[in-house]
Amino acid sequence: MKSLRRDLSSNPQASNVASKVFVRSTKSGKVQKIVRELYLRQDIPCSSKLCSLCPSIAPSDANGNIAPFVLSDRPAGTKAFPRGHYLVPDTNALLNGMDLFEHTGAFYDVIILQTVLEELRNQSLPLYNRLLSLIKTDEKRFYLFFNEFRLETHVRRGPEESINDRNDRAVRAVASWYEEHLGASAKKGKKEKSVPAIVVITDDKGSIKKAKAEKVTALSLSDYVSGLEDSEKLLDMISEAREARDSKGPIGQLFYPEYLSMSKMMTGLRAGNLHQGTFNVSPYNYLEASVKVPAFNRPLLILGRDNSNRAISGDMVVIEVLPQDQWKSPSTKIVDEEAVTRNDNPDSEETEAVVSQNERKALQEEVKKAHGKNAEGKPQPTARVVGMIKRGWRQYVGHVDAGSTGSQAASGRRQQTVFVLPMDKKVPKIRVRTRQAGDLIGQRILVTIDTWDRDSRYPTGHFIRSLGELETKGAETEALLLEYDVQYKPFPKSVLDCLPSEGHDWKVPVSKEDKGWNGRRDLRDLLICSIDPPGCQDIDDALHARKLPNGNFEVGVHIADVSHFVKPNNAMDLEASVRGTTVYLVDKRIDMLPHLLGTDLCSLKPYVERYAFSVLWEVTPNAEIVKSDFTKSVIRSREAFSYERAQLRIDDPSQTDELTESMRNLLKFSKILRQKRYDAGALNLASPEVRIEADSDEVGDPLTDVKTKAMLDTNSLVEEFMLLANITVASKVFDSFSQTALLRRHATPPPQNFEDLINQLSKKRGMELDVSSSGALASSLDRCVDPENPFFNTLVRILATRCMTSAEYFCAGAHAEPEFRHYGLASPIYTHFTSPIRRYADLLVHRQLASAIGYEGEDGHAVIEGVNTRGKLEDICRNINFRHRNAQFAGRASIEYYVGQALKARGEKMAAGGTDSGIDEEGYVMRVFENGVVVFVPRFGIEGVVRLEDFVLPGEAGSRSVSERRELAVHRTTHFDPEEYTLRVEEKGHSEKERGVDVELFQRVKVNVSSVKEEGRGAGKRRVRILITG
Amino acid sequence: MSNQRQASSASQTPHLSPAELSYLYTSLSLPKSPIRPDGRSPTQFRPLTAESNILPGTNGSARIGFADGTQAIVGVKAEVEKTVLSTDTLASGEGGESTAATSGHGSWVQMSIEIPGFRDDDALPVFLSEMMRESLVGAVVEGGDGGGDVMMAGGLKGRLVINKRWHWRLYIDVLLLSQPLSYPLPLLSLTTHLALLSTKLPKLKSQGEEDPFFDDDWEVAEYLYPRGSKLKATSGLASQYVRPPVTLLVVSVGENVIFDPSREEIAVADAVLAISVTRDTEAGNLKLLSIRTIDPPSRLTQPAVPNSENVNMLGATAPTEDIAVLNPATGEEEVPGVWRPRRGGVKRSVIANMIKTVLKKGGVGEEVLEGLEGVEVE
């Protein structure tokens, strides 16, 4: 039998077509073979400004312009490459040294290959995103070269060649092509310009060897960096991950069990034997974590290092429930990593066990507790981490643990290993190798985690940069912003280009014929005013009320028309959607929109005409809404009040002008609305908020700036109408966009969230909390009153708030309609509409509402504006929810820091006068642990842990230094009753009643608040110390 | 056309006169040295062109074209599927591990044949696909003899088992590109064979009873019919001893056994047999999988009338000219040169001869397999 095979070699087109074949496993378990055809081309430019060939062949856009070339014609040289050089990094170089590539001191003119970019995406999505943003910026001159599409640089995979080898070969092929190409172009140009060297950077030793054979210049990352100036600093920024693996060779003692393979995890997850969730470390005990999984309605506990198995707070982990005999109750003890692992040495790996003696002791005591008989301490299911889905590692702000640097710290440039203590207590210490240990002590630094190997007790990371001295304003503010992932860089030029060209001179067009008036109602004759906190510059909202001829009233809420200035999908819109919200710190505001818009053009400033988006209601004198109307408008605010001034004006009977009358009407309506809302079951929640008015003079006591928020009638006036506007808009938007409306919901908290609080209240006060509905909760909260303790009610409200879930933005299609409910406000539907200057969600809702009412925009064809696909909207929701939460945390942390600094300033002043006695205040016990309590100080809105040594026992001098007090801890014992929530602290061997201190939950205690410097290992850190004095 | 559609057999008879049929029959039945219309030897196949891996999106594919212009393309696709345990196995509890879960199930191989002019539920495609599928899933290698490859224990069915809960499902799509000029079975079978040879399955990364998880690199995908080691390939031995089965069409005319019959040859055959063979041991011995008889079209041809019985010819010929002679193959009395439709039935010795020709060392079966092996897969 003869058979002949068709011959393809004669086909001239064959070499232009290549294909990429791979296997794709889908979520549903399907396995597909995917074939992508590649049509190779020759018009992809090298993008070097030196090149004389490429400009003529590069593809042009519709206007005949070609993309500007990126790589400099005079690239920087180094000692080794005096004629200048272009860099071609391999994937492993980027994995190990992304921070270096982002560094502004070096690494310019880099050619990023498509091959490398794709490989990077498969290995690390965050790094991929960072690289993309690097490519987008112009300064660093990173060029993305589509080498796989270019005929000359496309590399076909050889038989039995691994993907890795093939990609390495592709990198080398590009380097030699560039060399040849630039050489040819220089020859053709006959210019005596010297051709820069093409340097491949790879950490693959095999590839370097092959490069040598192929006459391609290749260096390892560290070799290359060593040849640069300032190499010591730069060398610190290379990731430890690869190096550690290489150098160690035989792996030492393995402390942690290995993670399961992906397929094992998937099998387990599908079968329901394993569970997946986010690893969440307890703020009070770093050895205890919880993971909330969908299968159970209570989070699972994870106790101890063994069980956490290298998970770090924020990681997506796979866990396995432990057998019942290992179930434990959550700890009743405050455990600080710093305290327990004080004496660890970062260099010695050999002697350390994964669970140190001290830690084991701490755990043992918990187990004992768990076996106690009490009801609350009933053992809870525990679990252990068996696999890792996704690391949630980010960059961490911290400081070098001075105790870990060793004696010769200052002496030399020798590389040594130090511990970095992250600011976030939930993150373990990070082992960092550095050559600059001496310089870094006392600095706020940014580090990142690279790896956590099985044979290492702590994760290993590397140094990125220093933010400045500890406790300096600049460093601490930046630290805060970094820690909460707030985008604080100035707006790039592309964003500022989107602003109106008139700048501050922009005005509402005079002629009504102007296109700016299209679809706008003229409301300039209405008596509109705004009421805001004092000194507010970004005025989002203004109000009016007037009597109608039929005896009803017209009430209007006018919101800054930000969507007029921020057009969908331009650079400014994208930037705002990334920032998500404006972040308010004590002395700084990180704007979502550029200054010009936020504080001027959009801001509804008094006496000038502004574009607005108005919601108008006709209401009866009993505040029944007859109809509501939405329109884009032009308004002129008559006055901008602060809450106090508005209140004064309303209360002043001599003021009888129309504006004041209108405000009185508004106030009247707001009270009715408020009552209606409470009748419907809205909650009056409390959060420990204080306000800092930082503009008072330097001479006075800085603590006077710290004010608890006063609630005036005018506050709730504005609040009520904003709620009403939001609710009205929400239902309108939902009517028009049943799938894509952007709404806000507050899920009903599961009753078990309240179990602890209910238990505590009934034990300590005999009070009951009915959590069956928000209305029931509201009324039972109202009943939680202690006549002797006026703050008690607020305290309960704070604790109740913490039991609830947080409200979130969502897109209407994501939930069924009954799930839209806002629990706290007792409203069936809700959204955010009233603060578009500072929240991106409001801006989106503005666009949706504009489209819902058929507003056509200036040019008449902007009917559907903004996001109209659900997938994209859900992405945005995820982001703004995250940003919103972080902004709140950052704000609180900022206040906390400010209070600490104010206390410190006061302390220093007092110290000059002789004594540093702190300040005496009232505090309330929020939580009782076995070895301490958590106390809330309403005056400063702070809560702090009071440890054993910080109890001032009767007959003892209160003011002792920190180190003196620390000595006390060992001499003290406690009697802790977890059922009664009481703690008795006394001197060892002195159990007489009068020598000890008893504290119990909800108790009002006298405390002494001061800011103290930590000594010893934590030197340079400052904390607010609370002493219980009685 | 309608009667052609209904045909389940090789009955697409060319329109030949009884005289032509008789001439063909006579030359083909010449003892020991039949003369075929195209001059081939009895065991000679028509030349063909073959290539594999022509469809990049499939797991394996092949195209074969015969010189007469008939062409077929076969694509093989594989899909992961959960093994459903039958209720009675579940009821029987732990001990009764489903045989299907461990040794595979015939229904995991699906075959569809498309022939121009036929609906997919017409008799011919259904019959053909069932005939080919049967030998595919029926080819079971005895694991115990030690010669069989571990991976192919249990044959193709066994190869499709991933673990107790998961298996591969194989879709074999056969497309005949031209009108069926001759009975398409050999063409389709050869093409399917070639396609299966080139079929690869993604490499399994998970182990044991885990949910399957595969390597995303296609280069490391493994052949459905595993290759032997390189050493064997270079030493000239068959590089691969477990092969998908091949179904050969064999006809007998008189005492003669003729392979790869053309349409005209089938039209006069005494018997048409589809013989499936495979090789599953290292020694290289072929194994007979099945023999199926196919309704010979010669049954339906018009008979010729001997002169002696022809009224028109009465007295025109000498009565001695058409004396009935005993046909040694069929044992019937026939007048030489006068066509009589075959009535079926074939002698035991002829069938034995057929099988021997296929299976013997250096026989037709081996020749075919070697020829197909010559088509470079990859």
Residue ranges and their predicted role:
Chain B
Residues 1-378:
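Polyanion-binding surfaces on beta-sheet-dominated domains and ring/shell assemblies
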